[in-house]
Amino acid sequence: MRGMGNMQGMMKQMQKMQKEMAKAQADLEVQEFTGTAGGGMVTVKATGKRVITDVVINEEVVDPEDIEMLQDLVLAATNDVLKQIEDTTSQTMGKFTQGLNLPGM
């Protein structure tokens, strides 16, 4: 019967961890991230749900003769913000799986 008490304790611990993970995920989804390129000439903001909420382009980089550079800056700023979201998500959610030795995690 001692094994049953241990199993119940483990189940409670898992349920608690699931709740904490859900809260962490919800917090990440509403967090705002900012990516930049060109020394801040282009800024892209997004939520943790990877929804772009704002794009700001400094007028100094708008050159009708060099649209390609502007496109590259927007792309770089977008990739920067997405990487920040990915890194923060991995770091935050990794705290829950650390030390569990789960296959594939």
UniProtKB/Swiss-Prot annotation:
A GO cellular component entry from the record: bacterial nucleoid
Subcellular location: Cytoplasm, Nucleoid
Main location class: cytoplasm
S-S bonds: none
Protein keywords: Cytoplasm, DNA-binding
Molecular function as annotated in GO: DNA binding
Domain of life: Bacteria
Signal peptide as annotated in the record: none
Subunit structure: Homodimer.
NCBIfam families: DNA_YbaB_EbfC
Role played: Binds to DNA and alters its conformation. May be involved in regulation of gene expression, nucleoid organization and DNA protection.
Family: Belongs to the YbaB/EbfC family.
Name listed for the protein in its UniProt record: Nucleoid-associated protein lwe2654
Organism per entry: Listeria welshimeri serovar 6b (strain ATCC 35897 / DSM 20650 / CCUG 15529 / CIP 8149 / NCTC 11857 / SLCC 5334 / V8)
